[in-house]
């Protein structure tokens, strides 16, 4: 059946529908229930209710402490977040033996939308009828701009010695790069905790 290339609206919804249609309805429902339980479990983790969250939200920390927190987070997550997203996009190939041919494209589209946002793109067209985007508005450079606002130099960043736990978080995420399921699960947890 030939396709008419006319409908480019709602790519996120189309990708989700394509993913849903690529597996039996019972498996989709089972996955939704698993996701609901996982979110509830994450919400119950001590890190989700840690007193530090309230302290951060209420602005009770001094500049030195905030600077250290931002450098820790930079090392643990920020520097490698898009690496993990791109790896997840590549690893969708692991789905193909279990699904119909081409089904890996649906999660790739969803990941692409996230990647575009991370890379500084916005919905819409620019003055030349091309994609709206600017790499300087990518999340990683914006994070580096925040560190600039804290007065940190490039040398400060390069010479920073992260804590053992920040290093372990980074190593754990990087160790997931060979498994689509692992890297996507860790990215989801990271997104959930940041939000």
Sequence positions of predicted segments:
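Non-heme di-metal
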Residues: 2-195
């Amino acid at each position: 059946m030939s396709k008419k290339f006319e409908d480019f609206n709602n790519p996120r919804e189309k990708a989700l529908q394509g993913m849903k249609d690529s597996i039996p309805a019972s498996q989709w429902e089972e996955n939704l229930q698993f996701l609901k339980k996982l979110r509830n479990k994450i919400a119950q983790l001590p890190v989700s209710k840690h007193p530090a969250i309230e302290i951060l939200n209420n602005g009770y920390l001094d500049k030195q402490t905030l600077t250290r927190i931002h450098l820790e987070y930079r090392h643990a997550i920020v520097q490698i977040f898009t690496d993990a997203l791109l790896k997840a996009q590549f690893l969708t190939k692991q789905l193909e033996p279990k699904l119909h041919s081409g089904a890996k494209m649906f999660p790739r589209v969803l990941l692409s939308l996230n990647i575009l946002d991370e890379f500084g793109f916005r919905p819409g067209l620019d003055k030349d009828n091309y994609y709206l985007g600017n790499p300087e508005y990518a999340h990683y450079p914006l994070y580096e701009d925040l560190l600039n606002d804290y007065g940190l130099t490039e040398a400060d960043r390069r010479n920073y010695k992260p804590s053992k736990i920040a290093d372990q978080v980074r190593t754990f995420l990087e160790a997931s790069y060979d498994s689509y399921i692992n890297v996507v699960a860790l990215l989801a947890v990271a997104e959930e905790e940041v939000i």
